[in-house]
Amino acid sequence: MSKKFAHTQEELEKLSLKELENLAASMREKIIQVVSKNGGHLSSNLGAVELSIAMHLVFDAKKDPFIFDVSHQSYTHKLLSGKEEIFDTLRQINGLSGYTKPSEGDYFVAGHSSTSISLAVGACKAIALKGEKRIPVALIGDGALSAGMAYEALNELGDSKFPCVILLNDNEMSISKPIGAISKYLSQAMATQFYQSFKKRIAKMLDILPDSATYMAKRFEESFKLITPGLLFEELGLEYIGPIDGHNLGEIISALKQAKAMQKPCVIHAQTIKGKGYALAEGKHAKWHGVGAFDIDSGESVKKSDTKKSATEIFSKNLLDLASKYENIVGVTAAMPSGTGLDKLIEKYPNRFWDVAIAEQHAVTSMAAMAKEGFKPFIAIYSTFLQRAYDQVIHDCAIMNLNVVFAMDRAGIVGEDGETHQGVFDLSFLAPLPNFTLLAPRDEQMMQNIMEYAYLHQGPIALRYPRGSFILDKEFNPCEIKLGKAQWLVKNNSEIAFLGYGQGVAKAWQVLRALQEMNNNANLIDLIFAKPLDEELLCELAKKSKIWFIFSENVKIGGIESLINNFLQKYDLHVKVVSFEYEDKFIEHGKTSEVEKNLEKDVNSLLTKVLKFYH
């Protein structure tokens, strides 16, 4: 184990403040160096270096549960925990995850937002039942604190009185936005020592004053709370320390020791700078949040420029065109304006498109109400994050049969973010819902046609599209979109047929081209719709082709294979179905091409499997 970064609690305690600051600086250099090569979450990690070091110094990482919300800011924790020798493999195939994972020695898996405080509450209960003296420490950002689940957990935690520390990393991504300059001024004015000493003086005053004066003093204290940052937490029954400087190690360590000694639930409010220590990233939240490989000196991406537009860019442009054409189109995203491409629409139509922060449930239900009022909502959301609003999809959209469009970005394998972010379940959890229509474009032109159709469609409808660019460009002529109608792209008398869905059409075409070079052939169908299927076309196909290969970027269970088998059973058709969808296991991180090769879903592996059926 390397000793440059890895430190036990005892070793950290022996370091002087200057040595700790030097350690923080070295860690920043290491993080910048590795992320510049591998990509990753840069600015959030640079902003949390001192917080992580202080956590490891005041608490025992070997026994106290360290819970990182989302955990994209856990790089310093990884280095302190002895991962330096494999840190260069960050986010690479078979390498170190960019998030926390129990298989790497972490307390709990994370990747989605706002779970940390609930985990801390559960850990508190378990520790109490075991009669142990451990203290959970949850590090959560102010952006993650905007989600309802965090407040549900705070509500119970404040009533429980369990020893627990919530370290709030406030980099002004959410908390400071609502009241802007006033909030910033008050946060600076209410320095920690002043606020804490004021509360102590009030407490002493209440002990000695007569009842009438006590009443007035309490009223004064309550009025004072209205302009202090800790009001919310104290009203929920939590102790509050802060705001403190999240880059001042002495101040953070002191606050953590104070919270630890309280033996109560306590929130420490630390103000940090996202991107701290890398001048090009400081203050530029969105640009440096999640990055690809870049040149450290210039900050410019080192990735070869892709002249093809991403599916997200295509969606954004098409929605802009539709919004200018149809004034009843509205839209929402949950804290992903740039990631979903909705930022362009929020900028142009601020009264029709909204970012509601990390609030997927609220996003869906609020748009359901707008649909009820005659508007046409487009909900722009990552496939993996729609999971967080499943009840709202059913209860508030499907049952009501409302005209809502779900635009699911990052469908399929997303690469380096790993199992918490792979978009491979949406087809399985949406297909069973009555009233729902599901479809996917294979290329840019079909995306445009599908979005136009989605606007005109009556009832809830969901389209899925990949991270990055479509593989196909103009290999096939687009078709008019009609409900439940597929497109026969390559038609012949082969007994073998390829059925593609979305990006899966491209994979099927790549395999088919390789087969054609070997003087083999197959029918190629773009399903377009997963629900409803084109039963007329499939019945015709079943007369000539008795072996169907499924190309779709979803898990097998509940995916296209399941839907096709249901169709075949319905009409008592006898066809052999071979699915190239994903197996029943979570897909880990790595470059998409490498992950596909590991899963034997790359073109060469698929070709090898298909060739076994040719004689």
Curated annotation (Swiss-Prot):
Manner of cofactor binding, per the entry note: Binds 1 Mg(2+) ion per subunit.
Domain of life assignment: Bacteria
Positions contributing to Mg(2+) binding: 142, 171
Single GO MF annotation: magnesium ion binding
One Gene Ontology CC term in the entry: cytosol
Entry EC number(s): 2.2.1.7
Keywords tagged on the record: Isoprene biosynthesis, Magnesium, Metal-binding, Thiamine biosynthesis, Thiamine pyrophosphate, Transferase
Binding site for thiamine diphosphate: 72, 111-113, 143-144, 171, 278, 360
Pathway the protein takes part in: Metabolic intermediate biosynthesis; 1-deoxy-D-xylulose 5-phosphate biosynthesis; 1-deoxy-D-xylulose 5-phosphate from D-glyceraldehyde 3-phosphate and pyruvate: step 1/1
Cofactor: Mg(2+); thiamine diphosphate
GO biological process, one term: isopentenyl diphosphate biosynthetic process, methylerythritol 4-phosphate pathway
CDD domains (UniProt xref): TPP_DXS, TPP_PYR_DXS_TK_like
Catalysis performed (reactions): D-glyceraldehyde 3-phosphate + pyruvate + H(+) = 1-deoxy-D-xylulose 5-phosphate + CO2
Record function comment: Catalyzes the acyloin condensation reaction between C atoms 2 and 3 of pyruvate and glyceraldehyde 3-phosphate to yield 1-deoxy-D-xylulose-5-phosphate (DXP).
PANTHER family: 1-D-DEOXYXYLULOSE 5-PHOSPHATE SYNTHASE-RELATED, 1-DEOXY-D-XYLULOSE-5-PHOSPHATE SYNTHASE, CHLOROPLASTIC
Family (UniProt): Belongs to the transketolase family. DXPS subfamily.
Subunit: Homodimer.
Stated name of the protein: 1-deoxy-D-xylulose-5-phosphate synthase
Species for this entry: Campylobacter jejuni subsp. jejuni serotype O:2 (strain ATCC 700819 / NCTC 11168)
